[in-house]
Design a protein with these regions (language model features):
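N-terminal signal peptide c-region/cleavage motif recognized by signal peptidases
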Residues: 5-10
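Sec-dependent N-terminal signal peptides
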Residues: 1-2
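Cysteine-nucleophile amide-bond enzymes
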Residues: 11-290
Length: 290
């Protein structure tokens, strides 16, 4: 049971909380550059100024989830073209921060570098313009950042926040003119956002939450706790809601396979392997192909 706790404890953007990253190998750096170049081409080819981008930072497939962490790739990010603005947990200060990360570095955060998955959601211009402007407004973006982090923050809780929750609330501020987190969550409820329901193996899992400083149960409804459920913000639930709200939004997934980089319109199913199927596009052929 404890083995189930570790991935969920870090699922919402902390990516193995406070472990020291090893230095990437030359091959891994080359892969990340190749992968990020393909993503950049997809975003620029659509005339985008912004894309929601998600990675498989941790393996959540046992809960029916492919992606664990999302941010906004911004064409005009002062940190560099298409750098990803995101919430991350600052281990040195013990607090969440906003972080602009280069696209290649974001790609390197994949759970399995040799077969990583990335998702892009390309929004229509009428949606992306307001979100792009707000994301680059440091004062307003920081105003939605809560100082207390929880990986399993309740989707409509105000006491804690995780990275994907901040992203949803940023969207509410951009499109619903919400001025604070409470207003943002009220607007999200009105617009049909419900987060993602994770069905846990059983109630004993909840007792183990006390072992992690990154998990909190205080705000989760009693009926969810009784049923061993957690309702939190994860990339898939956020992308599903955005596609319902903006039917013209385009979902594209890219993964690394032995054949090369594979692009799939509409995305991969959570349990799907990275294998070329009819309708897919091989973006970059691998030099390992025979």
């Amino acid at each position: 049971m404890l083995g189930l706790l570790a991935p969920l404890a870090s699922q919402a953007g902390t990516e193995l909380l406070c472990s020291r990253e090893r230095e990437a190998t030359v091959a891994e750096q080359a892969r990340a550059l190749r992968f990020s170049a393909a993503l950049r081409e997809l975003m620029e080819g659509g005339g985008q100024d912004l894309a929601l981008i998600a990675r498989d930072g941790l393996d959540l497939r046992r809960w029916g989830q492919r992606y664990s962490h999302a941010g906004l790739a911004l064409r005009d990010n002062p940190a560099g073209p298409w750098a990803v603005r995101q919430l991350y947990f600052d281990c040195d200060s013990g607090r969440p921060r906003l972080f602009d990360q280069g696209l290649a570095a974001f790609v390197r955060g994949s759970q399995r570098p040799e077969q990583g998955f990335m998702a892009l959601l390309l929004l229509p211009p009428e949606a992306s313009a307001a979100l792009h402007a707000l994301a680059l407004d440091n004062a307003r973006a920081l105003g939605l950042l809560h100082p207390d982090y929880s990986a399993n923050a309740y989707v409509f809780g105000l006491r804690y926040q995780n990275c994907n929750q901040w992203l949803a609330e940023l969207a509410a501020a951009a499109w619903g003119e919400a001025g604070d987190r409470a207003q943002a969550q009220a607007w999200l409820r009105e617009q049909g956002y419900a987060g993602t329901v994770l069905q846990l193996p059983g109630r004993p899992w909840l007792w183990l939450a006390a072992l992690s400083p990154w998990l909190h149960l205080a705000e989760h409804p009693d009926e969810d706790l009784a049923a061993a459920r957690q309702r939190i913000s994860l990339p898939q639930g956020l992308m599903d809601w955005l596609q319902q709200r903006f039917p013209s939004a385009r979902r594209v997934d890219v993964c690394e396979s032995p054949d090369g980089l594979i692009q799939r319109e509409g995305g991969f199913a959570p349990q799907a392997a990275c294998e070329l199927q009819p309708g897919d596009r091989l973006l970059v052929a691998s030099d390992r192909r025979g």
